[in-house]
Every structure is written in structure tokens, then in C-alpha cells.
Amino acid sequence: MRRRYNSAMPADAIPLSRIRRVLVTKLRHHGDVLLASPVFTALKAAAPQVQIDGLVYADTAEMLSGHPDLSELHVIDRSWKRLGLMGQGKAEWSLLKTLQSRQYDLIIHLTEHPRGAWLSRLLKPRYAVAPRVSGRGRFWKGSFSHFVPSIMGSGRRHVVEQNLDALRRLGVQPAHDKRALTFVPGADAEAHIAVRLQALGLEPGKFVHLHPPSRWHFKCWTAEGWAEIIARIRAAGWPVLLTAAPGDKEGHLIERIQTALAQRSEPPAASLAGALSLKELGALTAQARLFAGVDSAPMHIAAAMRTPVVVLFGPSGEGHWGPWGTPRLGTHQVIAQSAQFNCRPCGLDGCGGGKVSECLTSIRPDQVWAAIQPLLKD
């Protein structure tokens, strides 16, 4: 029987009813992986019979694990490189055999990573979709059945929508109510955080969660600015809880904030810096009145948990990376200096590549407080 033409769909739209298993790959950082979660939700809603697997780096697996529309989650461990040629080869071979056993009908490759082309050729799905990448040769172009076109001014289109464009290219229009981020902390993380909050004397919904650092210094605001904000939040009657990722890269800013508080004769802020897993961070921020921070994975986790977000943006673009979704109360608030700095968003690692972004460090505490204060009112 000839397929009926539908002008509202691509001419080469895939027949969803024939798809049984799908592999979605997102080989990027933590926040990038979380921003791919709506692909699973929207695809499952459009094709309930489909089993959807994910392939991510092992250190980002917590961003997707527990997703209700995820069948199996496969990982690539970047530490395999330290196993030597034989050890890495054995690990890669084991992963390949596992993926081959799943017999995928469709691969959705959401990045420009060259591994996607190899996987498409080795796994031999009926269909495979990837971004159209300028300058890629025959190997890339011959590895996929469908390509997502690049768009002018893509920095103004949110990453979530860009991920969903892979579905649109295949003829699947994502339902508006299926585009939310999904992050599942899990019962263990929630129980752990309940104990932690009780030990700190903090009640659910009665504290402000601040995550000032980013792994990238050029995305960070000043320690003095954060100390001023902490003082104002406290003066309004709200306790503050600081978090940061393990390690000195983020922990150093927390130390500087505590020092700045001491210089203001303020007591140190309660802190769980370096003490939480990503799942626990999600369970924590879900209990906060609001989250304040910078462009980082914890910001995206807070948005996924529907916690109101106040976020400071510098060289990265809020149209591309801003908080996604609808919070429990109020609205997400983005603070950016676009009028004063018409060079932003530039995407550089600081002005002139110097690791300090003036469009970010020039943000005044008054601007941040003006965004936070309304969200603290009952």
C-alpha cells in the first residue's frame, strides 16, 4: 500500500509504528545530558510501544537514571583510557556487543561527536538522525539517514528545542506538555537530604539554596557579591544553604564567600559544599524556596525540580542555556548585562580569554536582590 502524503510532515518521515527500540546518545557534560531528557518523554508519548535506551558518559549517568521513559542506560567510562590499549579495547567491545544485542531500529545522535557515526554503521539501525555538521566528509554524511539542519542564530534557540528538533526531523512533533525536564533524585537521596536538613535545622521550603560556583571560572560572579546577597537574604528572615561540587575548583569560591562574610562580621553560611551527589543535590534543591546561582548543571537541576531559579548569565547565552520549564511559584529570573555589554553572549572563556567576564562581574548586588526579593514573599 502506498504511503499517504502528509504535507505537515517531512517527506522522509519514519513510520513510528515499525519502531521497537531506539538508542538516544548524548555525549556531553552534565547539564547537556539533563537537557536531553525531554527527548525520551516526547518520543515515548508519541510511540508508547517503543523501548528507549540512552548512551552517555558514566559520570553524567545520574542526570538520566530513573527517567520513567528510559528502558536501559548504557555508559562510556572516560577512565577506560587509563586501562591501556587492551583494557580499553575490551571495555569498548563489551559495550558494542551489548548495544548490538538490543537490535535498534533507530539511533538519535544529539551531538557532533564522531562516535555517533561509528555506532550507526556498526549497529545498523533502519534509521539514524544526527546534526548536519559543516565540513564533515563522506563518512559522517553516509552514516545517517536523516540530518537535523543547522539554523541561523542557533544561540537564540534553547538547547531543549534543538534536541527535540531531532524528533521533528523524523516526523514526530513533540507535544507541548511533554517537553519538561525530568530529573529523578530517588528515595535514597531524598531520605539522605531529609536527615541532612534536619541536622542543619532547616525546614523544607523555608531556606534558600545558593550554588555560586561553576567548574568554569569565567561563569562565576564575585565572592563579595554573593556575601552581600547572603546578608540580605538573612536580613529578610531566610536561612541560606551553600553547595558546590567536590574538589578545589568550586570549593575555593565557597571559601572566599565565607571569608567575605567574616569581613562583614556575618557568621558563616551553612554549607554542604563537596558533600552531595547529583541525586542528593536534586533532592535538596527540590526542598528549597528558591535556587540562585550561575549557568551550571545545578541550575538546570533546580529548574527540573520546578524550584524557582535566579541565575546570573555572562558570556553564555540565556536564550540557549537559560532555566527551562515552569517553577512552582513566580517565574525563573535571568540577570544579564546585555544593554551594557553588547558583545554578549560571546561564548569566550572570559574577556579576551582571560577567565574573568566583566559582563558578569559587573552585575550589582542590587540587581540580584531585586530578582530574589519577590520570590521570598508569601
Please provide the spans of the model-predicted regions:
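Catalytic machinery of carbohydrate-active enzymes
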Residues: 1-378
